[in-house]
């Protein structure tokens, strides 16, 4: 049985992200996705607040065969309309986990995965020279990068080589480059 309620137009407009409501509105319980028994390829987003970037990373992770995407540190809402739109359906195929940093470390330890942080530091190594399969790689927020706390948890730091004078990459683009390297290393 499905419960039905009548709502006034103002409430329906508030609940719907569309300019003009299509009429019926429904709510659903979103089932949790099961993680694979053994994780080998994980991409971590910390504090990535742009929902378009989060959705794009989920879509790319699905295309490149990542085992899971982990969101930590106040990332954009996984089910915001912009995230869902940017994910282009991958949100319903790609396992995504939201957790604390402590839970992230426990998950990676349980799977024997090293964690590398993408960072613009002197300590960072060219990602092409780091064994990324199996591994987890963390990408930080658009403005601040990875937090000092998460960098301290990392087994190493990686950098995407760029042309002189290039400042940085968008978080979703950086994640895509990293995921391609992870996928290539695992082939």
Segments and roles (model prediction):
Residues 26, 60-64, 75-91, 148-187:
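Structured adenosyl-cofactor binding patch, chiefly the S-adenosyl-L-methionine
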Residues 39-77:
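Internal active-site segments that recognize and position negatively charged phosphoryl groups
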Residues 116-166, 170:
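Active-site/ligand-binding-proximal alpha/beta "capping" segment
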Residues 67-110, 114:
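Histidine/lysine/aspartate-rich catalytic loop segments that bind and position anionic ligands
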Residues 7-8, 46, 72-73, 95, ...:
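Short beta->alpha connector loops at strand-helix junctions that form conserved
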Residues 1-51:
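Arg/Lys-rich RNA-binding interfaces used to dock onto structured RNA substrates
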